[in-house]
Amino acid sequence: MAGALLCALLLLQLLGRGEGKNEELRLYHYLFDTYDPGRRPVQEPEDTVTISLKVTLTNLISLNEKEETLTTSVWIGIDWQDYRLNYSKGDFGGVETLRVPSELVWLPEIVLENNIDGQFGVAYEANVLVSEGGYLSWLPPAIYRSTCAVEVTYFPFDWQNCSLVFRSQTYNAEEVEFVFAVDDEGKTISKIDIDTEAYTENGEWAIDFCPGVIRRHDGDSAGGPGETDVIYSLIIRRKPLFYVINIIVPCVLISGLVLLAYFLPAQAGGQKCTVSINVLLAQTVFLFLIAQKTPETSLSVPLLGRYLIFVMVVATLIVMNCVIVLNVSLRTPTTHAMSPRLRYVLLELLPQLLGSGAPPEIPRAASPPRRASSLGLLLRAEELILKKPRSELVFEQQRHRHGTWTATLCQNLGAAAPEIRCCVDAVNFVASSTRDQEATGEEVSDWVRMGKALDSICFWAALVLFLVGSSLIFLGAYFNRVPQLPYPPCM
């Protein structure tokens, strides 16, 4: 008994399904047996078809700055009314919606006007929903690659305004009229709709605003009908963290190394130039990386490119400064003469201002009196030379202790043997050469000190130039913000 009842229920359910399918099939034949999809759904030729449009963004795939191409994944919601597909669900078993292939009904043929790859249409021809009263709804997905003029002035702290321009490929403004869709609360959706649950956030770009506007263009001079464009603007802001970590911070650190060249000795010009040129080469590599990222345009220079050019100029000036300081440090009295004014400014005044003067000289103790042993040696030499007894020499020494015996010695040396005179001349020559070398060493030391003074001046100048220039360049990016447009945020 229970089995028979179950079979009866299954049979009734199958009959009900079959009846429902028959009602849909009957509705299908009722609507499409005499339907012409190539004819516009109007009763009079001057009538206009109203098209309700809604764009839902599911993914901001990428913005290729090099090719100036924006890739997006969207759903295009299109609603309109076709009087030829009007029916009452009461006449067809309560069928509320009929799903039919899109090629069976009239379509407004909406395309993306500013596409870049020739794909004007949608990615998948979804079914069209036909509802009671002749209302049609079509929601096809699409992946668009559109043009986007990239402004690189403040890269990587920039924001871009990319547009999606839709229009009917076949019909003009007098044949179709575009309006924005309305939500369940009756509010007009005049922007790109972003479903926070379905939207996939982009790691490089954040969407700030996405307003839409409908713009009608006038016809030609002959009075022909114009076109209607639906323009959606995607105002996106770059997330600069990737570029800060991978480009800006290493670039600033490497550029700061060039200042370390001033801590090398003034005579080490080769090593200082090597440090500066190595930094210059590293900056060239960073500039090459930025050139591969930004579009090939002469309209503007990226902020990061301007910074790299600035630090390259600073590094070049430091190389020139190292060469000049090396030239000054290696000068000698035989090739150059130091003027008193230059000596005063660079060796006296400037070190005091910079707090880098030479250490104070330690006063030397007075030379001790000549010991008796040295006096005995002198007397022994005079005895040998003058052939006088030691007692007489001692007597003369006691009588002329303060200078007279030295004069007598010099007079008697004039009559001495030629060999002794040659020795004395050689000793005098050595003493004179030693005095000349000491004087020359002091002059060379002054030139080295002058090179150090120039190094100190240029170090502080380069440090101030580096800090001020870097601050001014990056502060410009701080003020480059998305303007507060009179549009609600997208998310």
From Swiss-Prot:
SUPFAM superfamilies on file: Neurotransmitter-gated ion-channel transmembrane pore, Nicotinic receptor ligand binding domain-like
Molecular-function annotations in GO: acetylcholine receptor activity; acetylcholine-gated monoatomic cation-selective channel activity; transmitter-gated monoatomic ion channel activity involved in regulation of postsynaptic membrane potential
PROSITE patterns cross-referenced by the UniProt entry: NEUROTR_ION_CHANNEL (PS00236)
GO terms under cellular component: acetylcholine-gated channel complex; neuromuscular junction; neuron projection; plasma membrane; postsynaptic membrane; synapse
Enzymatic reactions: K(+)(in) = K(+)(out); Na(+)(in) = Na(+)(out)
One GO process term, biological-process aspect: membrane depolarization
Signal sequence segment: 1-20
Subcellular location: Postsynaptic cell membrane; Cell membrane
InterPro entries the record matches: Neur_chan_lig-bd, Neur_chan_lig-bd_sf, Neur_channel, Neuro-gated_channel_TM_sf, Neuro_actylchol_rec, Neurotrans-gated_channel_TM, Neurotransmitter_ion_chnl_CS, Nicotinic_acetylcholine_rcpt
SS bond partners: 148-162
Highest taxon listed in the record's lineage: Eukaryota
Predominant location category: membrane
Pfam families noted in UniProt: Neur_chan_LBD (PF02931), Neur_chan_memb (PF02932)
Protein family per UniProt: Belongs to the ligand-gated ion channel (TC 1.A.9) family. Acetylcholine receptor (TC 1.A.9.1) subfamily. Epsilon/CHRNE sub-subfamily.
Protein's name according to its UniProt entry: Acetylcholine receptor subunit epsilon
